[in-house]
């Protein structure tokens, strides 16, 4: 068994009185938030900024203090990952999520994605593929409403 840590961002923007959340359509078919592995020597905030910029081109992120949530899941490595991690049958993954605001609307997608959407909460919660992501969005939405 192996352990991995990633950092993700619930990226949102405000337009008048409405909040729009950024969801990425991954090549594998699922919809989720930008996220990625922590590189050696990086802080969580550095990872968040790097991953969001690499995956979307967004540079003007304001990380919202007070929102930090963790999810855990396990999976079996496949394909190239299986070759790199010979002998590892199971990976336990921790993803730390932050909320981050942007004023950017245009996105420069990375090769990892085939699309994106800026969606209001009610549509975003239905679009996210995995229950962990839905739960993070629910918590972020509640947090942002209280912060108004």
Regions found by a protein language model. Name each.
Residues 32, 92, 118:
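Short aromatic/basic micro-patch
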Residues 18-61:
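Conserved Nudix-box catalytic region and its N-terminal flanking loop in Nudix hydrolases
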Residues 1-21:
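Conserved N-terminal beta-strand and adjoining loop/helix that marks the start
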Residues 57-105:
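Active-site segment of metal-dependent pyrophosphate-handling enzymes
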Residues 96-101, 106-138:
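NUDIX/MutT-family hydrolases
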Residues 139-146:
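C-terminal alpha-helix
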Residues 11-13, 25-26, 101-102:
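Residue-level signal for short segments within beta-strands and strand-turn junctions
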């Amino acid at each position: 068994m192996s352990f991995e840590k990633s950092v993700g961002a619930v990226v949102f923007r405000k337009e008048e009185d409405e909040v729009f959340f950024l969801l990425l359509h991954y090549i594998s078919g699922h919809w989720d938030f930008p996220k990625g592995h922590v590189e050696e020597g990086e802080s969580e905030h550095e990872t968040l900024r790097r991953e969001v910029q690499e995956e979307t081109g967004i540079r003007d992120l304001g990380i919202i203090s007070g929102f930090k949530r963790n999810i855990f899941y396990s999976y079996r490595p496949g394909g190239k990952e299986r070759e790199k991690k010979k002998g590892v049958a199971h990976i336990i993954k921790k993803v730390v999520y932050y909320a981050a605001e942007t004023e950017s609307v245009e996105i420069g997608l990375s090769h990892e994605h085939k699309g994106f959407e800026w969606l209001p909460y009610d549509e975003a919660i239905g679009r996210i593929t995995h229950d962990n992501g839905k739960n993070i969005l629910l918590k972020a939405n509640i947090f942002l409403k209280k912060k108004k």
